[in-house]
Amino acid sequence: MAQKKGGGSTRNGRDSESKRLGVKVFGGEYINAGSIIIRQRGTRVHPGANVGIGKDHTLFALIDGQVEFGVKGALKKAQVSVLPRS
């Protein structure tokens, strides 16, 4: 006779793949046009001067230059800009 019960199956054991969100280029760094600055869900950080926004809210550089983070408006929303190289 069997001394153990049959091992049942589990309903766990799976997880979603990470989406690799976050800041890709930090303040003060130089960046080329078209390079991704931030990948995000929603507009946690808003685009400033010379920064474009993709349909998935990804922020990217429109020109070659230096990345600068700051705040804008009375509500102090986070913003990222690209300053042209001088």
Curated annotation (Swiss-Prot):
Keywords assigned: Ribonucleoprotein, Ribosomal protein
Annotated PROSITE patterns: RIBOSOMAL_L27
Residue spans of biased composition, Gly residues class: 1-10
Gene Ontology terms, MF aspect: structural constituent of ribosome
Gene Ontology cellular component list: cytosolic large ribosomal subunit
Spans annotated as Disordered: 1-20
Pfam families: Ribosomal_L27
Gene3D superfamilies reported in the protein's UniProt record: 2.40.50.100
Record-level GO BP terms: translation
Family membership: Belongs to the bacterial ribosomal protein bL27 family.
Protein name: Large ribosomal subunit protein bL27
